């Protein structure tokens, strides 16, 4: 673990390292007297790091992925629920990097329906059949998904070192969009290597 700070000249310093390895031992921010409950949503980080190696992301290649236990997440959600928060934005870089854990998380989220809605970032190329079935059975309105497509050009994704085949991602996106019980948005990223401006507009209209 490193130390991040501003020096006397207000320049950012981190000694080249600022990483929390014992992520599950951090104090819950919701228990702090300084936590800001004035917003209509709360951001919740249940994992830190990412299995993927996307060159455009600061978390790309940050392994191992560190996780909180389901019980620890439940305790935090209980606090959030007691404060009347109805929207939780899960900050995990790839919610379904581990499909078994993703299914356990979805079962946990069910416990808070209809009081809390969850916003997740999901990699559509990694959807297993089991996770698809789980998503299809969730209560109406429990989830709002952001599906990371990033580009409709395979060479752009390969150059950006993003794992997952485009064909699989599009198949997963098609499935997610067919589900009537949740809202799904697809993400594209402008400015990726080899991604020309006209191609971005073509992808938007596809």
Q: Residues of each region from the PLM?
A:
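A general structural signal for short secondary-structure junctions and capping/turn motifs
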Residues: 34, 205-206
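Radical SAM [4Fe-4S] cluster-binding motif and immediate context
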Residues: 28-180, 190
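Catalytic cores of alpha/beta
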Residues: 131-135, 193-205
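Conserved beta-strand positions that form and line the central face of beta-propeller blades
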Residues: 14, 25, 159
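A generic secondary-structure signal marking the coil-to-beta-strand transition
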Residues: 2, 11, 22, 40-42, ...
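A short, charged helix-loop
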Residues: 17-33
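C-terminal EAL-domain catalytic cores of bacterial cyclic di-GMP phosphodiesterases
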Residues: 185-186
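Glycine-rich beta-alpha loop elements in corrinoid/cobalamin-binding modules
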Residues: 1-17
């Amino acid at each position: 673990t490193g130390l991040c700070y501003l020096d006397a000249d207000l320049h950012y310093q981190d000694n080249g390292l600022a990483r929390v390895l014992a992520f599950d031992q951090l104090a819950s921010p919701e228990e702090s007297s300084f936590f800001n409950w004035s917003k209509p949503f709360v951001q919740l980080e249940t994992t830190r790091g990412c299995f993927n190696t996307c060159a455009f992301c600061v978390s790309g290649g940050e392994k191992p992925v560190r996780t909180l236990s389901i019980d620890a997440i439940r305790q935090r959600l209980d606090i959030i629920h007691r404060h009347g928060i109805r929207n939780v934005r899960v900050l995990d870089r790839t919610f379904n990097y581990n499909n078994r854990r993703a299914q356990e998380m979805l079962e946990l989220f069910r416990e808070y329906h209809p009081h809390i809605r969850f916003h997740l970032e999901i990699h559509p190329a990694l959807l297993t059949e089991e996770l698809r079935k789980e998503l299809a059975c969730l209560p109406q309105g429990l989830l709002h998904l952001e599906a990371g497509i990033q580009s409709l050009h395979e060479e752009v994704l390969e150059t950006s070192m993003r794992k997952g085949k485009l064909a699989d991602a599009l198949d997963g996106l098609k499935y997610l969009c067919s589900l009537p019980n949740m809202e799904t948005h697809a993400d594209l990223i402008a400015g990726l290597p080899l991604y020309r401006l006209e191609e971005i507009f073509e992808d938007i209209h596809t």
